[in-house]
């Protein structure tokens, strides 16, 4: 698309602002969750949400665009979505994309985050999740890493799904439930 961190992020924030105006929504107990591209969105929004969210959960999200470029098995995706490689300084689309990599905004993170990943993920390598978890912890953010050694981009094994759901909803309960 060439518009990572662009219109979609503005749409997310506009949508949550509109939803938060509804009388049945407690704007002080909003969470933000996403997987894959949604997981990337969580990382980006963690540095740009201006207090809207009280908890984040990212499942297999992209955290560092440059590291991702050299470690995924799907370069055609990144060449299309990012606009090209990070070393192509003449490519304005690519440079705009890399300038907005979520890892560059960790200094603005201030909200608890759970990070879920599968060690067998070749689409978005689990090291992306490890980097985000480490950054959050070093920045003093309450963070939890849930890592499945026998899963890839999706959690498919029934016993792991039970753990995934327990962890996911436990995190939301911890930070959003009254």
Residue ranges, per PLM feature:
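Active-site-proximal cap/loop segments of hydrolase catalytic domains
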Residues: 1-178
């Amino acid at each position: 698309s060439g518009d990572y961190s662009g219109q979609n992020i503005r749409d997310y924030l506009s949508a949550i602002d509109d939803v938060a105006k509804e009388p049945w929504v407690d704007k002080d107990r909003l969470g933000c969750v996403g997987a894959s591209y949604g997981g990337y969105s969580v990382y980006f929004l963690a540095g740009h949400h201006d207090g809207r969210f009280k908890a984040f959960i990212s499942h297999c999200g992209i955290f560092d665009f440059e590291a991702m470029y050299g470690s995924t098995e799907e370069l055609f995706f990144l060449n299309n979505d990012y606009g090209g490689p990070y070393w192509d300084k003449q490519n304005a689309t690519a440079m705009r994309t890399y300038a907005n990599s979520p890892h560059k905004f960790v200094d603005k993170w201030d909200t608890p985050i759970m990070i879920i990943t599968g060690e067998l993920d070749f689409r978005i390598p689990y090291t992306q999740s490890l980097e985000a978890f480490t950054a959050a912890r070093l920045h003093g953010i309450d963070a939890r890493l849930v890592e499945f050694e026998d899963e890839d981009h999706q959690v498919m094994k029934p016993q792991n799904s039970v753990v995934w759901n327990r962890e996911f909803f436990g995190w939301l309960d911890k930070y959003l439930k009254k």
